[in-house]
Amino acid sequence: MIWLETGSFTLSQPLADTCASRLQLPERRISRQVVAKLVQAIHQKARVEVDYVSLSNPEHEGRIFSPHSIVKAGSRFHVRGYCEKSKGFRDLVLSRFRGIAELEGPSPHAIEQDEAWQTTVILVLSPDPRLTPAQRAVLTSDYQMENDQLHINTRAALANYLLKEMQVNTKYLDGTPEAQQLVLVNRDDIKQWLFNS
């Protein structure tokens, strides 16, 4: 097995032939045509006109969007770029695009202008202090922490997604520390980058 040689455990061979398994999450419907146009717009540094729906606005709504990166965050893909409707850099979920995307010419909004994308933050995670010393030691070992802390470098624009994947709630502590497990130690340092901070 590869993990014996590298220390990294990935499931790349067919699972039916192995002693391992993985979750099969439902896939979100993503239009190939829309993704092709978004990738073309990224390479050409162009704007694209798209129809987009969201939970806050479930009706088809046209947007002019200047994409710069496609990101897989957990179980979904989104595209990062400048939204002219919102007048700022945003993440749009790929499965929420509707209709046909059309290129609209050069974009004045470059990836270098996306402060949250260009900024690197360090997330400092630690075992929930409400856990017993033995429980904290388990997590310290799981995550190979040094001095009971795990430091993770990430783009500020991706910090929320990383925290969600690590099941770290930044707003309140879960009622049971076994459910919370990890806490964000340096919340004040990265507060400006957190959703609904």
Give short role names for the model-derived ranges.
Residues 117-197:
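Polybasic (Lys/Arg-rich)
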Residues 17-146:
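Core beta-strand-centered patch of the WYL/Sm-like small regulatory domain
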Residues 1-53, 165, 169-177, 181-186, ...:
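Bulky hydrophobic/aromatic content
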